[in-house]
């Protein structure tokens, strides 16, 4: 004997899903049904379950009217023992704002208590197993379910309509502790994708008009022109940034935005570049975001911090250049060539001034001078580092 709370936004298949998962098995097992779900079609149910209509026992309570809501609110006064209660929009029956004083109006008369009826609302839900009642409740939001019911239920069932990602008639069913909302990943006990059989929708009237439509958010992503356009723009920006399209003459028209030759002589002052003597070309002419990092109008922002893009950084006594990458303990490590040898970027973790942020494809990285609020956009030169040992000598003069 259980209390099931099925909840989800309108159109998330909570009623049809609960009917399919809870009500039909109860009917098949011969249970007496007490429900407020309108327009149940017994003939279609019987055909689907392969049983006779005469074997289906359903008691309908019209909760669209106040008298019906009060009757259902006191179900333990009169409900047959071992009945299955299927109550739609339970927040209308027992609003969560009801106080202990309000609920006393639902208390059982002494003569019914003498007939082994629960004496109060709280006792009815706490002892539903004792009386053989299974109770299935649906609501748009589990917050609309009274706390005393949630405490007795233990488990909630959250519905999410997968039509929002183009998969009509499917929903994700997440089980969770009824004390929480089920909306966080950490709340989920189990998660399943389910598809409701089409005959289920013809077994009841989901609206007072008898007509219902799937969520308008159910347009498939690959059919939405705005989404396709957005994906196209994002793809071009990432390609422009990560795959060197800003250096391709086909895209640049052969302008001087290309990186200078790697064969040029080292600069006289200590700078950071993508190769010895080369100049880092900052992507200042376009804007995009990767996670918390955004590039726009010649500036790089990371969270609340803002840095001006520059062509080089002044680093005392030595220059740093990206020389390649190396697989170490299954982790891709970018090295820098210094006067002391090749230094992994991990050593920058101990720096108060300089920080290094690799971008997702490790083709580029950003070096931040936190004191000067400057950022240098650097492209990784492929190949092995000059030295593989981690030479830390003299690094204190930098960091």
From Swiss-Prot:
UniProt keyword list: Enterotoxin, Toxin, Virulence
Pfam families named among the record's database cross-references: Zot
Annotated phenotype, changing residue 349 to S: In strain: 86015
Result, substituting residue 281 to A: In strain: 569B
N-terminal signal peptide: none
GO molecular function annotations of the record: toxin activity
Entry function: Increases the permeability of the small intestine mucosa by affecting the structure of intercellular tight junctions (zonula occludens).
Protein name stated in the entry: Zona occludens toxin
Organism from which the protein derives: Vibrio cholerae serotype O1 (strain ATCC 39315 / El Tor Inaba N16961)
Gene coding for it: zot
